[in-house]
Amino acid sequence: MSRLREEQRAGPVGQSVSLADLPLREDLRGKSPYGAPQLDVPVRLNTNENPHPPTQALVDDVTASVHAVAGELHRYPDRDAVALRTDLAAYLTSQTGTPLSVENLWAANGSNEILQQLLQAFGGPGRSAIGFVPSYSMHPIISDGTQTAWLVANRADDFSLDAQVAAAAIRERNPDIVFVASPNNPSGQSVPLDALRKLLDTMSTGILILDEAYGEFSSEPSAVKLIDEYPAKLVVTRTMSKAFAFAGGRLGYLIAAPAVIDAVLLVRLPYHLSSITQAAARAALRHADDTLGSVAKLIAERDRVTEALTGMGFRVIPSDANFVLFGEFADAPATWRRYLDAGILIRDVGIPGYLRATTGLAEENDVLLGTSARLAETELTRPIPSVP
């Protein structure tokens, strides 16, 4: 056997060292990385993607746009992504009715990088961030990564955000950063603007990061409308990974007062957005009307799934996003496995008794509902008796 084959058979170089052997920061020991299961199954409803593929016109535009910049790949991209940010400002001005300019926008590789940059600029050692749980699991992970102390306040029993209770928690803890997701992931509820005003008025210092990753699905107006009212306190983050069907393109952005963008520029890495990403995202924005045409279809499907699951005896949390949180299961992890055994991948988000399912294509949702009808007879805390 050759030496190369012996090495391949023995395993990767350096495997004798474990994570415990490394000089890792003490505050990161024992932590777990983010990760939704990536499994090859017939029905994948676990990562809240838009199930509708891009149109051929969009594919052709992305291909042509990338081809146009390919000849310049030996050069660094536009460091500040001015053209892309200008296009994003135009899109949001049209969608929200709030006049925005390039100075109000910043873009990065997914909204998680946006959140990380915000925590680098406004969080860090000696500072704190508060979240209202259950909510997006990356908020505490990014806080840990930037050595920002993570504080927790609970949502109501129905997972909604009680503005009065949340304001009291802010008043008591006085965090430097307040995280609010609207619609909330994993429960799906939106937060009305009046409730956000209550939180912002309570804050004596710091910023409120309003995570609108699922904003295009929401029945509530965007908090972008409040930026001019609270320019030193409010930052709105969004993504093209959900409604925009651009998850593979990895493009997130924030909307804020120009001074906030100036702050982020202090911590961003140079040339962080590739020429290819910028070109592809601009092409996607040119086809916004066609792509977002699927939003109404997904909302209708979400409502159909909600009604059907409710009729089967499940408790379904009313959702303003492209997913539903449902239960109440006697053993959610075990039920998650039974869905997987049936070829359906949904998400165990760590809430006892509940699982989350993305709204898929009609035929995918039919498979989910068929399996759910069978599981309702055995998996719920109060199983529905089978009909003879």
Model-identified regions with their sequence ranges:
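N-terminal small-domain helix-loop-helix segment of the aminotransferase-like
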Residues: 6, 14-110, 117
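Conserved PLP-binding catalytic core of the aspartate aminotransferase-like
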Residues: 298-299, 307-342, 359, 386-388
